[in-house]
Amino acid sequence: MQDDIKDITIIGGGPTGLFGAFYAGVRQATCRIIDSLPELGGQLTALYPEKDIFDVGGFSKILAKDLAQNLIEQGTQFGCDVVLDEEVSEVEREGDMFRLVGRSRSYLTKTILIAGGKGAFEPKHL
């Protein structure tokens, strides 16, 4: 199998990672998002999807799940590959590239953007 080399690989599919994917697309860079969670959006979708968010420019308030959906649409509009339920456990330098080692396979990239937020998490049910 031939490796699919990306210009940028983003570790983390929360708000920062999604905006990074958007900006990569604007700059016509190929990209990939790798996230350990089963869906994009980070804490917005995993912890408090029904919470109102008040500190986002352009909105007096917006539900976290709606903000996440907007960010997902914006971040993936240029065709960024998305890999979910995958954790990067190792980074290896290979010449002028990096190999990111995950549970299921490895990924070659020219640049890494780490946007892991607080890392993998699960909500605690009381």
Please give the residue ranges for each predicted region.
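FAD-binding core/adjacent interface of flavoenzyme oxidoreductases
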Residues: M1-I11, R27, V82-L126
